[in-house]
A protein has these predicted regions:
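N-terminal periplasmic/intermembrane-space "pro-region" immediately following the signal or transit peptide
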Residues: 20-74, 84
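Outer-envelope beta-barrel architecture signal
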Residues: 46-58, 91-97, 129-131, 178, ...
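Transmembrane beta-strand segments that form the barrel wall of outer-membrane beta-barrel proteins
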Residues: 59-68, 94-105, 119, 133-135, ...
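Residues that define the transmembrane beta-barrel architecture of outer-membrane proteins
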Residues: 73-81, 114-119, 174-178, 185, ...
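Residue-level signature of outer-membrane beta-barrel architecture
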Residues: 85-91, 125-126, 137, 183-186, ...
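Outer membrane beta-barrel
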Residues: 86-200, 227, 405
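Signature for the C-terminal beta-barrel architecture of outer-membrane proteins
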Residues: 130, 167-320
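Outer-membrane beta-barrel "beta-signal"
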Residues: 354-356, 389-394, 400-402, 414-428
Length: 428
């Protein structure tokens, strides 16, 4: 039990002992973890750094979580190693491997466990400059919105270890889907076809399991066409289906308004089960449902980006349906919350989402980011805040998150009401 605590402490000591005072830029953020951001540009006279095909960091964290009220708490610690390699084997052929190992321990039995996440492991072949074929585990992501992505269908069952509630980190730090995917490119758009075969019918929570039962539980397919109407307007049309899945139609739009504002809209429609039906395991008829997220992002001249988003999920419960759940099943509300987390779906019928990212906030090398989501059915909220300070090879991170609302509300029913975490990351 003590080995994880000792390993976390060792990682923190190693990070603190690393040279962190050189006036150079922080290492580039790995593409599979957007919460690590470079802040300083190299001087024009400095030679360009040679790009490496791999990225690797270790991280240690200490966390305190409150359950329902501040008088009931537990502590946990985590030691992680995270790496990615993107190597060219021959001209036109790449091999990509991305993995994260989280060693976790808590003084509350049954809360935490070690988990390894194979995010990506695939070969990518480009027979021509306009064609790409991928085979293996690929993190297939779609969606123009930020907080909620109705067209990101392969997110279901993909998150094994939640290290941050930041939507960007959740999208990156997840298992990919085993697919055969082909893409045809042209100057103003692309056409993509993906096939994901059934490989297992049940998830496997073993530490080093590939967990294909979560990512590939049935045969599925996806067709995507994208086009660029102008320098300021992009569109993407998607069609998704598979074994036991009614076809789903999706649309993504994004456009530039002025020099500092991006507007976006994401929509999906098709027949499917409600969250309540899935949480209770009943066989109710599938109904036509729509999902949507629309909003805008405004970026100021001083590196502050603000995003406002309206979210809608017709599969989510209304206030009356939510309050009726305990009468149907004693654990119906917790079951719905667990189902929405597994599916990465919005647990309410509608919500508002605000996100802010401030790079070089107040002082150079300090990033501040935060979001609040308020669902409109029971008027509860989830809030998250992160402060991240960068040295050359070390990040110091503080995170806080809280679920607020009455105990009968959607987010107020989450048992882990408040969490604070301190972490150190060391780039190798």
């Amino acid at each position: 039990m003590r080995r994880h605590t000792a390993l976390s402490a060792l990682l923190i000591f190693t990070a603190l002992s690393a040279p962190a005072t050189r006036a150079a830029a922080a290492p580039d953020a790995p593409p599979d973890d957007l919460d690590a951001l470079s802040l300083a540009d190299k001087a024009p006279t400095e030679p360009a750094a040679v790009a490496r095909p791999w990225r690797l960091f270790v991280e240690g964290s200490l966390r305190r979580t409150s359950i329902d009220d501040p008088d009931s708490r537990y502590e946990s610690n985590r030691a992680s190693i995270d790496g990615r390699i993107d190597a060219t084997l021959t001209p036109g052929l790449r091999a990509v491997f991305s993995d994260r190992l989280d060693l976790r321990h808590s003084n509350r039995p049954g809360v935490e466990g070690d988990v390894n996440t194979v995010r990506e492991a695939y070969l990518s072949w480009a027979p021509t400059d306009h064609q790409i074929i991928d085979l293996g585990r690929v993190n297939v992501r779609h969606g123009s919105a930020y907080g909620y992505n109705p067209t990101d269908w392969f997110k279901e069952g993909a998150v094994r270890s939640i290290v941050s509630l930041d939507p960007a980190v959740l999208r990156e730090n997840r298992q990919g889907t085993v697919v055969l995917q082909g893409q045809q490119l042209w100057s103003v758009g692309s056409l993509t076809a993906a096939y994901s075969p059934a490989l297992a019918d049940k998830p496997n929570t073993g530490t080093f399991s590939l967990n294909v039962g979560a990512t590939n539980p049935r045969n599925r397919w996806l067709l995507v066409g994208s086009t660029k109407f102008s320098d300021k307007l992009n569109a993407e049309v998607l069609l998704y289906g598979g074994e036991g899945i009614r076809e789903q139609l999706g649309l993504n739009l994004s456009g530039l308004v002025g020099d500092a504002t991006v507007v976006f809209g994401e929509f999906s429609a098709g027949k499917g089960p409600s969250l309540i039906t899935q949480a209770l395991g009943t066989n109710a008829d599938k109904r036509f449902q729509t999902r949507a997220a629309v909003g805008l992002t405004y970026t100021t001249a001083f590196n502050l980006s603000l995003t406002a988003e309206a979210e809608y999920n017709e599969a989510g419960p209304t206030r009356r349906q939510w309050r009726a759940l305990p009468g149907i099943s004693p654990f119906g509300q917790l079951g719905l919350l667990n189902t929405s987390q597994t599916l990465q779906d919005l647990p309410a019928r509608s919500a508002g989402f605000l996100y802010a990212l401030w790079k070089d906030a107040l002082v150079r090398r300090l990033d501040l980011s935060a979001f609040v989501r308020r669902e409109n059915e029971t008027r509860s909220r989830v809030q998250w805040l992160e402060a991240r300070y960068h040295w050359d090879q070390v990040d110091l991170v503080a995170q806080w998150q809280q679920f607020s609302g009455s105990r009968q509300s959607i987010f107020g029913s989450v048992p882990q009401s408040r969490t604070i975490e301190l972490a150190l990351r060391f780039y190798l």
